[in-house]
Structures are given as structure tokens and as C-alpha cells.
Amino acid sequence: MASALWTVLPSRMSLRSLQWSLLLLSLLSFLVMWYLSLPHYNVIERVNWMYFYEYEPIYRQDFHFTLREHSNCSHQNPFLVILVTSHPSDVKARQAIRVTWGEKKSWWGYEVLTFFLLGQEAEKEDKMLALSLEDEHLLYGDIIRQDFLDTYNNLTLKTIMAFRWVTEFCPNAKYVMKTDTDVFINTGNLVKYLLNLNHSEKFFTGYPLIDNYSYRGFYQKTHISYQEYPFKVFPPYCSGLGYIMSRDLVPRIYEMMGHVKPIKFEDVYVGICLNLLKVNIHIPEDTNLFFLYRIHLDVCQLRRVIAAHGFSSKEIITFWQVMLRNTTCHY
């Protein structure tokens, strides 16, 4: 009996080892085939931003505005305009912002306007969704939309739309911020920060990313091809969670966008334009003003930040309500 058992166990162990070996061999074969199927490009170590530049504005986008703000911003002089990228189906996210950090239109007498940036829903869109979006715009008048397809890979087109809209329809805004629907903005802190600046020209700030490497791996959301971006390192840029700029930079960046082919990552794209314009990013002295990665913030931390990324609509409402309470913070 014991002898038979010892005979069976090694055979089972051998079978299991064989199975693992075959699995690893299959995985290795897949990786080799995947690597061989890739076009082989040499990563360019030394960056030359003129690689992206065309002398004629051949990349000027001519998409049409299908929805615009109700109020005529060209006749206003807002201190700050906040432009929020949003997907057509993100109704709850937009509403959460409208009743929290985007609700108040004046801070200490300084006008702050908030608008949402959208593309068109896919061709097979729910007609009820399209209708409700029209109704939403009639009700709030804060949606800006063009007729390009609203997809993740078209985020750069949405950013170009933002720069065009400010240039053509809201040129008097002293400062402009671009952000996303999953970002918590402490609007009061943002206004205070801008009021305390020593200069109001050639100013661009946010969460700085310096010497950030281009990713060539499997994860499609952060992958960029060699054809699209051949350099090893991205330019200095500010994360798309929220970057802020002075009025004078908006038309200059928008004009440059007509000469630079859009790439997948809108924040990197803006960084390329800034480098071509020889504009340096302003790095905040306080490193806790912008949070790129999701962290567990308490109310006292939220009172110190300008922008924190990774919040759901429900969390934005909850944290905003908590932040407004008379809680004593010992800094």
C-alpha cells in the first residue's frame, strides 16, 4: 500500500511540473511573438521639440461647436474660468460639481465661472441620453460641446477645444484652469493662491511631472507608441488632474496647437507646446497643493489643498459638506 502511494505521488508531481513547464513555455512563446511583432524603433535619447513642429498650421482643428454657454463670456471679465472635461453620460459627476465646488460664482468679489467640456456620444448613442443632455444644457447653460467623438483617445481634442473656446469666446478671463470630473477643487484656496501671485503673465502651474518616462508596456491607457512619441522622456508638464494658466498663455498655446500634431496624452501635448514656446512650468513651493494619486484625505487636509484627484461624485459631495463645517484645524 505504502509502496503504491509513493509510486503515485512522484508521477503526480512530475505531471504537475510538466504542466507548469508547458504553461511557462507558452507564456514565453507569447512574449517572444509579441516582441517580434512590434515595429522596432530606436528610442531617441536626446529630445528635440522641433520634431513635433510644422511651420504651417496643418493641425488646426475645425470641429463645430454644437453646444455653447448661455452667458456671453466675451462680455464678461471673470477672474477665473474652470473648464472640466466630462463624458456625456457623466450626469451625476457634473451635478455633484454644480452643488459643491462649482456652485459659488463669486469669491470675495472675484468672479469664478465653471463649464463642462464634452464631445459627441458614439453613433449608437442612446437617443434619450442625447435628449437629456440637451435638457441639461437648457437648464444650466454650462456645457461646451464639439462634434468630435467623445473617447479617451480624443481627450486631446477636448483640450484643444478648451483653448479655442477661451481664445474666441472668453478672452478676458484672467486665469484659466482645466480639470476633470473626478477631481476635488478647493475653489476658495485656488482663488487665494492666484490672488497672492507676484506675477500674472507667462504663468503655468499644477502638479509638475519632470523627467517622466514614456511607457511602452501592455497597459493601453498609459501606453504610447514609438510612432506617436519617439523620445524616452516626456517634456516637463503638469498632470491633467488640474493645471492653471494666465490669460496671455491661452491664445499662444492655442496658436501653437495648430502647428503640433495631437498625441494621445493631452497634458503631455500641452507640455510640448509650452516647451516650443519656451515657457517654464511654475513649481508650487507648497508640495501639498495638488494630489495626483488617490489618498485618504481628512477635512483639515482638504482645507489646505487646491486640487485632489480620484474622487467619486458621492465623495465630492460628502467631503465638501464636511469641509464647510466649523471644524477646528491645528496646522
UniProtKB/Swiss-Prot annotation:
Entry membrane topology: Single-pass type II membrane protein
Q: Which UniProt keywords apply?
A: Glycoprotein, Glycosyltransferase, Golgi apparatus, Lipid metabolism, Magnesium, Membrane, Signal-anchor, Transferase, Transmembrane, Transmembrane helix
For the keyword Transferase, the answer is yes
- Sites where a glycan is attached: 72, 154, 198, 212, 326
Which cofactors are reported in the record for this sequence? Mg(2+)
Taxonomy, superkingdom: Eukaryota
The text of the family note is: Belongs to the glycosyltransferase 31 family.
The protein's role, per its UniProt record: Transfers N-acetylgalactosamine onto globotriaosylceramide. Plays a critical role in preimplantation stage embryonic development.
Q: What is this protein called?
A: UDP-GalNAc:beta-1,3-N-acetylgalactosaminyltransferase 1
The encoding gene: B3GALNT1
